[in-house]
Amino acid sequence: MKVYLIYVLAAVAEIAGCFSFWAWLKLGKTGWILLPGMVALAAFAWLLTLVATEAAGRAYAAYGGIYIAASLFWLWGVEGHAPDRWDIAGGVVCLAGTAIILFGPRG
């Protein structure tokens, strides 16, 4: 369960950090919004190093599904746009892929 918590925290940090650039460049927010955004992006990178795996690529691949699901929650909770059925179906498929990567037998 610890790995899921790390991935969820990493996703929130990455999305918040990237959104700071979106807010600055597309929504006309002040450039100062980039400071907490860059801290969030650094936290995201650090959090992924806490995943117990021998290969960075595997950690990143498994994280991808969590990121997608978290992005859909961000879409709904922060931006006020409800995900449609295709968003939800895609998120479920990605989470299934994450589970396969995390829990599949290793040879």
From Swiss-Prot:
Matching InterPro entries, A to Z?
UPF0060
Q: How does it sit in the membrane?
A: Multi-pass membrane protein
Q: Which keywords belong to this entry?
A: Cell inner membrane, Cell membrane, Membrane, Transmembrane, Transmembrane helix
Q: Which GO terms describe its cellular component?
A: plasma membrane
Membrane-spanning regions, if any? 5-25, 32-52, 59-79, 85-105
Similarity section:
Belongs to the UPF0060 family.
Instruction: Please give the name of this protein.
Output: UPF0060 membrane protein Atu1058
Instruction: Please tell me the species this chain comes from.
Output: Agrobacterium fabrum (strain C58 / ATCC 33970) (Agrobacterium tumefaciens (strain C58))
Q: What is the lineage of its organism?
A: Bacteria, Pseudomonadati, Pseudomonadota, Alphaproteobacteria, Hyphomicrobiales
